[in-house]
Design a protein with these regions (language model features):
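Lipid interaction determinants
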Residues: 2-9, 18-291
Length: 291
């Protein structure tokens, strides 16, 4: 994707917000680091994903010093030396956290600023915990990738409206959107991160070319049968699954929206060899099998 402007980035605005659950109300007091259960998961711990909403100064991050991360109900934005990154994010009360960046508006030719070089400290982040008024981002082993300090003030550039840099508003509706997801039904075995890493295709055969591939590096790619898309994902205990989605083309064809399925999912369970994706209320979104 070329770094042009937000008009192109917003081509599929509907998918940008598919997982942008943002919530507010910082926790008080520092909590212990999450305990790794397996690669890519952390133990349940009291967490307030709504408390992530805000503009944060990035500290103690490899090549991230001085950046500002803004998390709001309309998505994620990272302000750094490269310009302004556009993306989406998700988090849950288990302390899971994931950001996917898919657009960059900034000066062409800045060294190390290709879209493919999303900052490593952010791409490695798969969880969060409170630290006083700040937040700590951690990787899948519970090791810190960055410290977030409150009170940052991003500057609006030529491609941003003033409202896009103002302190995000946390409504009751937004808070409710971060309520704990319904547990998996007893008939499903919780999917683990290791078990999810694979290429999956929707059951039914309506769109033979549709698939989603979950990578071990936390990235995913897929197609509804004729339109490609991608994002990032993280898995946790009890079948918790969060994924971000990025832009896609809009070619019409017989399709299955597997990317949207993934972006809407809060839990993943196995019915034998079949992967079942569920929404926050426990409703079934879709079923897939290994390719």
């Amino acid at each position: 994707m070329r770094r042009t402007g937000y008009a192109m980035m917003l081509l599929v605005a509907g998918t940008l917000l598919a997982g942008c659950a943002d919530r507010g109300g910082p926790d008080q007091g520092a909590s212990a680091p999450p305990t790794p259960l397996e690669s890519g998961t952390t133990s349940p711990a009291p967490a307030d994903p709504a408390g992530l909403i805000g503009s944060w100064s990035v500290a103690e991050a490899d090549e991230g010093e001085g950046a500002i991360l803004r998390l709001a109900s309309d998505g994620a934005r990272l302000f750094d030396r490269c310009g302004v990154w556009l993306g989406s994010w998700r988090a849950d009360p288990n302390g899971l956290f994931v950001v996917g960046l898919f657009g960059l508006s900034g000066p062409d030719g800045t060294e190390g600023c290709a879209l493919e070089s999303t900052p490593g400290w952010l791409s490695r982040a798969s969880g969060f915990r409170s630290n006083g008024d700040g937040r700590i981002l951690v990787d899948d082993q519970g090791d810190q990738t960055a410290r977030l300090l409150p009170g940052a003030t991003p500057t609006a550039g030529p491609n941003l409206a003033p409202s896009e840099v103002e302190p995000p508003v946390v409504t009751d509706e937004v808070r409710r959107s971060f309520a704990p997801a319904v547990e998996l039904p007893a008939t499903l075995l919780p999917a683990t991160r290791a078990g999810l890493v694979d290429r999956w295709v929707p059951i039914g055969g309506r769109a033979p070319k549709a698939y989603v591939e979950l990578g071990a590096d936390g990235g995913w790619s897929g197609s509804d049968g004729c339109n490609g898309t991608s994002g990032r994902w993280v898995a946790g205990p009890a079948g918790a699954l969060l994924a971000t989605t990025g832009p896609s083309t809009l070619v019409g064809c017989a399709s299955v929206p597997v990317g949207s399925w993934l972006g809407d999912a809060w839990r993943a369970g196995l019915d034998g060899d079949v992967l079942v994706l569920l929404d926050a209320r426990g409703g079934e979104i879709g079923r897939l099998r290994r390719a």
